[in-house]
Amino acid sequence: MSYTRGEKERRIMEKSGILKNKLFLYLTEFFAGMSVMAVELGASRLLAPYFSSSQIVWTIIIGTIMIAMALGNIYGGKSADRSPDPDKLYRRILIAAIWIALIPVVGKYIILGISALLIFTVSSNFLIIAAFVACMVIFVFPLFLLGTVTPSLVKYSVDSLDDSGKTVGTLGAFNTIGSIIGTFVPTFVTIPAVGTSITFLIFAGILIALAAVYFLSSHRGQKKVAVSAVIFVLCCGLGYSDSFAFWQNDLSYEGESIYNYLQVSEDDRRVILSTNVLFGVQSLYMKDGGLTGMYYDYAMAAPLMIPDKKAEDMNVLILGMGTGTYATQCKKYFGDMSIEGVEIDDKITALSRQYFSLPDDVKVTTYDGRAYLQAIDEKYDVIMVDAYQDITIPFQMSSVEFFTMVKEHLNENGVMVVNMNMRGNNEGNINQYLSDTIASVFDHIVTVDVDGSTNRELYASSNADMVKTLENNANETGHSDLRDMMLHVADTSSVYEAGDYIMTDDKAPVELLGMQVIDQLIQGEVVYYKDIFEKDGINGLLESL
């Protein structure tokens, strides 16, 4: 007996009894949309510890996911026309779910493997290329499969042209509502509460359950469901609370907040907070309470650049408090000065009390630095801007408008000190942009390079004699280590000559500028390790790591 195409489709749908109820089709669309957004947000958190959470990385994630969804839409539509068997759709959902469940288990290894391969072969734009390739390898396939859902469901749910608009509109509404929930739940609930790995597992489990309901109700595909369930359970065991920095087994703390990946490590001398697996130190605390040897020591010059006022009588504001390294050092060396900090990540503030001995009398407000300045009227003797992290430089805290706001909150002869964490030497680099922007607001600018690092400290004030004031006050301090450090800052500082590289709220290309400096730093490291490899072979390379 032969059947027309329409009759074949009806017979297929009759075999899949649960699909006679359009509610299940709508729920499929709902959970597919929810899972796509959850995976997208999870992707940003998986990549951030390795490549940063800059706008560039977000662009790569969104772009690759949209490519995957578009290809999935095309394939799903053609597949549904060619063979309108719902088994194929729910099989694809099952495969996508398994792939998503595997991400916590193998994702970090894929990222590091791709980085290792590319670092010796890519001459520029390493972070962009590495993040793009990692995103393509890890996320395109499962989201391509989920992209086939909508056109397939349209095929199964439209019975006649009379109500086709209503049916397609309802499918779109369920997809959109699911996407909204898939946006808010990971960000505000699952990632802060249980982490990125379990977030992937939760939404993979939802998709497996969805496919299981279909296959079990149709009395087909029980083996597929059983195998998927076993793989999912294994992924839960292997991927649960797995470390991003899996090669380190001596971490005091590793976790996530709404804003950051967080890692605390310590040895006999110091405690370190990092927000990136591969590079950078976000905060540091010396257990003996002394100087750190890092940029915080150079920033200590700011209170000593103010004439005719004792440091202990000053009030200091820190934008980008971190774990309070600067505040702790100021308390030790300058006595009972008034210090308050602004930190957007309250989990970092909690870590500062738990691991970094932040003094109890240092007030920390959980807020965005610029928004905080807009909300207050107080003025300060010193304002430290330390909100720049790897290549994640907030554009709203690097513009003329922002630095004008800082200036308005400084007392007479007050000093703004800015930690610029990526020192570049080429024309038009990120530091030149920042320095020129600040110089367009402040009368006098002094900079000093931090020894042994990529940091540069910038001091801005209306006081033309900042360096001379620093020398005089340094010689009067009762701490010999601080005096020597401050005299070193004075000796190595230079007056900045302003240029025309200005950033505004409307135009501040901080991500691209930061990426250029990171590329230069990476290439410098690659040349170093290549030389070791050519001289001493693989053994020498391993010993140097």
Which residues make up each language-model segment?
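Alpha-helix N-cap and loop-to-helix initiation/capping positions
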Residues: 290, 397-398
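Soluble small-group transferase modules, centered on the S-adenosyl donor enzyme superfamily
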Residues: 221-283, 288-295, 301-307, 446-545
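Acidic low-complexity segments
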Residues: 351-353, 357
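Alpha-helical transmembrane segments of multi-pass membrane proteins
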Residues: 2-254, 266-269, 277-281, 304-314, ...
